[in-house]
């Protein structure tokens, strides 16, 4: 044992540990989970933390805080890795490498419609719909660009099912040649299925297979004198070859994921390059948070690299076996590579190998990943040095003793009192935290009363934050002295004291750079120079709160107006309104619909259909 004085209970616990696979949770004196780990042999692994040979800075810092340890025995290492991954996502322990939630990374979803599947962007924590998923992609823009490419080449529909069912003529997507109008049966289910299969192969990187099949189908069309279909197939081949030329970084056979990692104090960068059929299909960067440690000690640097790699394996591959490739290539030796190969192969149902520092042609894949890794790290450091300098400037401006770790900002949006919505956005030292943004539908107030709206939103928000003990260091209100005073009163009534409250009003000209800051704690108002870093940070969070509020307000206003428009028609209640909207996809399409189409909606009589039609055609 090292020089740490273990309690008698903990020392006894270490001797009684089983020599079986499982996971362990290390807790501090308050019962907070500090670290979650997995082990093939719980007894050996947990005891190793308390060995004299374990001199890593991070390990010593962790061990000094451990008051108790909990274990869960599993049937296999695979089960242990899955459980570890799920617990890290749920508990987010201080000393684990933490990757961002899956919601941050969007997917492409192909629905399981029996005849005409839909392609769409999918990103949600909710239970995913059935169908095929591809991704994750580095961002929404990458998904949208890929979807547009698929629409141009394969003409897969992207409209909602309710809209699809309601069509009586082709929409604009057909006019611009991005859809074959399956809604009005301009294409048979059999031919549409061929397009969907080609789109799936395209997303899997199997371009050459598609090209061969398209060429064969084009020959058949020509031999049958079907020159129109042959021309369509010719254009598909041309577009695919163009993409193949743009996409191919290294033209080699095989499927692989190339993972390059760089660990720095406080963060790591993981560059994952997806290669299918010898072509680079995707390259994306992940930035997990890693525990701070002194990285000039070789042991700590290597240990954090290993943890980062294992955390990524759990995060990226274990939720879906379809993502596991034949080969994973990485740029540093892995202590448990054989164990990870076994786990991934079991999960996949066939072999998955891990290759370290490849030679020959595959080394070019690694070179590509490492080059992208360096660029990603440089961009991240540049961006976050700007963020840190802005946080430091705000700390100095507010004369705070401690660093600002978390800020929240509230804004109110409405149109002359209609559809009032409050927004709350969250920033931490990494910048915006969109997954923690919240909207509040404001009810029961006098329309247009911003003070009452702000009071309701802040009260609801802080009652919850007090329960979960997650209070911000700085609270920003997009408003003047009156709104800030209301918020101060709310915080006082809830017993919240240790928060810096700051108002940001637009000033007399309402121009950026002329904002007046209201510091309630010191009862003073002031204007910052336009080049102030603190002002830039406040403008950023204020603008984000405003954007989020106005987006929510517009959605609510549109929904309210649709409901009020339909319910003003005698005989149309909530159920019939829903049936109409599901059938036609929206108010605009309903307004254009002929009388005979409205009659087809379930629950709508001919007399009521006539009344609805006349409402839109007075």
UniProtKB/Swiss-Prot annotation:
Domain UVR: 208-243
Keyword DNA damage tagged: yes
Domain GIY-YIG, first and last residues per copy: 19-97
Source taxon at top rank: Bacteria
GO biological process: nucleotide-excision repair; SOS response
Main location: cytoplasm
CDD domains: GIY-YIG_UvrC_Cho
Pfam families cross-referenced by the UniProt entry: GIY-YIG, HHH_5, UVR, UvrC_RNaseH, UvrC_RNaseH_dom
Family membership noted in the UniProt record: Belongs to the UvrC family.
Complex formation: Interacts with UvrB in an incision complex.
Entry function: The UvrABC repair system catalyzes the recognition and processing of DNA lesions. UvrC both incises the 5' and 3' sides of the lesion. The N-terminal half is responsible for the 3' incision and the C-terminal half is responsible for the 5' incision.
PANTHER family in UniProt: UVRABC SYSTEM PROTEIN C, UVRC/OXIDOREDUCTASE
Name this polypeptide is given: UvrABC system protein C
Organism of derivation: Legionella pneumophila subsp. pneumophila (strain Philadelphia 1 / ATCC 33152 / DSM 7513)
Gene: uvrC
């Amino acid at each position: 044992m090292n020089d740490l004085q273990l309690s008698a209970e903990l020392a006894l616990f270490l001797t009684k540990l089983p020599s079986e696979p499982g996971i362990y949770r290390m807790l501090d004196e308050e019962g907070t989970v500090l670290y979650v780990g997995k082990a093939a042999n719980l007894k050996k692994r947990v005891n190793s933390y308390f060995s004299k040979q374990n001199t890593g800075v991070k390990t010593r810092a962790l061990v000094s805080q451990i008051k108790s340890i909990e274990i869960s025995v599993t049937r296999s290492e695979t089960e242990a890795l899955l459980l570890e991954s799920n617990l890290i996502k749920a508990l987010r322990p201080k000393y684990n490498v933490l990757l961002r939630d899956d919601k941050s990374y969007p997917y492409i979803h192909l629905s399981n419609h029996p005849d005409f599947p839909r392609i769409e962007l999918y990103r949600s924590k909710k239970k995913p719909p059935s169908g095929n998923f591809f991704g994750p992609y580095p961002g929404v823009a990458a998904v949208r660009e890929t979807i547009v490419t698929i629409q141009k080449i394969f003409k897969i529909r992207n409209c909602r099912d309710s809209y699809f069912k309601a069509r009586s003529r082709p929409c604009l997507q057909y006019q611009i040649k991005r859809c074959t109008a399956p809604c009005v049966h301009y294409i048979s289910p059999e031919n549409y299925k061929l397009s969907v299969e080609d789109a799936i192969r395209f997303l899997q990187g199997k371009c050459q297979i598609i090209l061969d099949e398209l060429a064969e189908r084009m020959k058949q069309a020509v031999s049958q004198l079907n020159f129109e279909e042959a021309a369509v197939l010719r254009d598909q081949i041309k577009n695919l070859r163009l993409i193949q030329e743009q996409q191919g970084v290294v033209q080699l056979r095989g499927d692989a994921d190339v993972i390059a990692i760089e660990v720095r104090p406080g963060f790591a960068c993981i560059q994952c390059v997806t290669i299918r059929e010898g072509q680079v299909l995707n390259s994306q960067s992940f930035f997990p948070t890693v525990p701070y440690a002194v990285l000039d000690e070789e042991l700590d640097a290597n240990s954090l690299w290993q943890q980062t790699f294992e955390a990524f394996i759990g995060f990226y591959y274990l939720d879906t076996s379809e993502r596991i490739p034949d080969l994973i290539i990485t740029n540093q030796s892995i202590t448990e590579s054989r164990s990870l190969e076994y786990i991934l192969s079991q999960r996949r149902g066939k072999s998955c190998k891990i290759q370290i520092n490849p030679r020959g042609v595959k080394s070019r894949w690694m070179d590509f990943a490492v080059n992208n890794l360096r660029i990603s790290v440089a961009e991240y450091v540049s961006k976050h040095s700007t963020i840190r300098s802005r946080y430091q400037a705000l700390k100095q401006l507010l004369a705070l003793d401690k660093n600002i770790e978390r800020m929240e900002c509230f804004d109110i949006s409405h149109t002359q009192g209609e559809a009032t919505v409050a927004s709350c956005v969250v920033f931490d030292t990494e910048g915006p935290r969109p997954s923690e943004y919240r909207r509040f539908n404001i009810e029961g107030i006098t329309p247009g009363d911003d003070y009452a709206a702000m009071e309701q939103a802040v009260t609801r928000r802080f009652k919850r934050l007090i329960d979960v003990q997650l209070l911000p260091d700085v609270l920003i209100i997009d408003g003047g002295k009156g709104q800030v005073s209301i918020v101060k009163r709310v915080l006082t009534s809830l017993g919240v004291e240790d928060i810096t409250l700051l108002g940001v009003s637009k000033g007399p000209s309402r121009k950026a750079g002329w904002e007046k800051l209201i510091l309630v704690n010191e009862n003073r108002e002031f204007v910052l120079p336009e080049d102030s870093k603190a002002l830039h940070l406040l403008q950023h969070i204020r603008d984000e709160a405003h954007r989020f509020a106005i987006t929510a307000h517009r959605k609510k206003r549109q929904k309210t107006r649709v409901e009020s428009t339909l319910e003003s028609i005698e005989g149309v209640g909530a159920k019939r309104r829903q049936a109409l909207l599901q059938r036609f996809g929206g108010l605009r399409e309903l307004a254009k619909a002929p009388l005979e189409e409205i009659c087809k909606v379930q629950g709508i009589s001919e007399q009521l259909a006539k009344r609805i039609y006349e409402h839109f055609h007075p």
